[in-house]
Amino acid sequence: MAAGGDHGSPDSYRSPLASRYASPEMCFVFSDRYKFRTWRQLWLWLAEAEQTLGLPITDEQIQEMKSNLENIDFKMAAEEEKRLRHDVMAHVHTFGHCCPKAAGIIHLGATSCYVGDNTDLIILRNALDLLLPKLARVISRLADFAKERASLPTLGFTHFQPAQLTTVGKRCCLWIQDLCMDLQNLKRVRDDLRFRGVKGTTGTQASFLQLFEGDDHKVEQLDKMVTEKAGFKRAFIITGQTYTRKVDIEVLSVLASLGASVHKICTDIRLLANLKEMEEPFEKQQIGSSAMPYKRNPMRSERCCSLARHLMTLVMDPLQTASVQWFERTLDDSANRRICLAEAFLTADTILNTLQNISEGLVVYPKVIERRIRQELPFMATENIIMAMVKAGGSRQDCHEKIRVLSQQAASVVKQEGGDNDLIERIQVDAYFSPIHSQLDHLLDPSSFTGRASQQVQRFLEEEVYPLLKPYESVMKVKAELCL
């Protein structure tokens, strides 16, 4: 049975990233139509530049190519590739079939990587351009969430054990800070992308030097003109047959890092959902379990974690691919890159769409948070109580021993009897502590235990987050809708 299948058929496997999760716009960027249309555009740009620099290419040939950029006979191309065992030459023939007058000058002087690699770089750039505003929107939604809850005390956790208090907004800023680093890295790697350009079979530009009869300047002009037509500021000066596969490492490393950030955020949300302090959106008709109707599973956060793990592992592909590119190139890269580049971007696209949807509907339960604080705060307040007693004339050592005994009794009630923490009640009825009984409410005010959390939130948002989001103001209103 021949390899390949009808990918629109229910009898043929289709990647869930495309069929179930990723956005239509990201799927289109990695589609065959987008790819092969870009090949034709690159052939047109090459012909236009070659004509401008004096090669015998007519206006009629150029116009014929322009008129057929979208006229792609995919069936013919597939048949040609089956016959020739070469995808680029299959599309040269297919393009030439609908451009008979231009057929002889299509791909003039070029090698397969002229269309293959340059198209990949265009796709990487455009895919990054799709991700950047999506990530900015996630940051914006979380920034709104953090600002609104900047002063809401909550129990902090280290080692997932109760620690000092923080605020809900401050905790959210930990998430935002990681995503801001990801946004900066995505922008950097996007701006650092260079075009492969017009380089020939081993990167020496020998074929173009021959076409222009040894004119170095025209060869350099050709490279520059096509690079500018493709919208790049610069091209690699040095290439082998391909652009260095280190570029793929750079791009997928940034995406993998984004995956790590999203995994951490969504894990926190899942843990908070278990504590009943916070939940992701839950639709009115949504079913959490087929057997347990009360369940409210954090399905979206779980999906993000599941896909983020996949995204983090994909960076190993370009690392290994770059390491086995012998001399000017081997074909070890080809099949692998067809999979890992598309999957990385479709996965990143999915987790950003999902995280935006989550961040637009996060639900906080202040009463649950308050109750958990009441359970733990008495123990945390013991040092403040000791200091207040010393100020009232008591002995630190005597007070410490009193607190120690009462704390152990209260802990026994919590752990052995399943009761509430009654340390404060014990202190309130103990005559030894009568000098500070009137101060206990103040000493137990949760806001006095959150330090500068709310001020940190305000400063972080104003100095770091809002300036970073400013270039994306025009796209901030787009909502994230999930079908599944």
From Swiss-Prot:
The active site is at H159, S289. It holds the Pfam family Lyase_1. This is Adenylosuccinate lyase. Ubiquitously expressed. Both isoforms are produced by all tissues. Isoform 2 is 10-fold less abundant than isoform 1. It is linked to Adenylosuccinase deficiency: An autosomal recessive disorder characterized by the accumulation in the body fluids of succinylaminoimidazole-carboxamide riboside (SAICA-riboside) and succinyladenosine (S-Ado). Most children display marked psychomotor delay, often accompanied by epilepsy or autistic features, or both, although some patients may be less profoundly retarded. Occasionally, growth retardation and muscular wasting are also present. Pathway: Purine metabolism; AMP biosynthesis via de novo pathway; AMP from IMP: step 2/2; Purine metabolism; IMP biosynthesis via de novo pathway; 5-amino-1-(5-phospho-D-ribosyl)imidazole-4-carboxamide from 5-amino-1-(5-phospho-D-ribosyl)imidazole-4-carboxylate: step 2/2. SMART domains: ADSL_C.
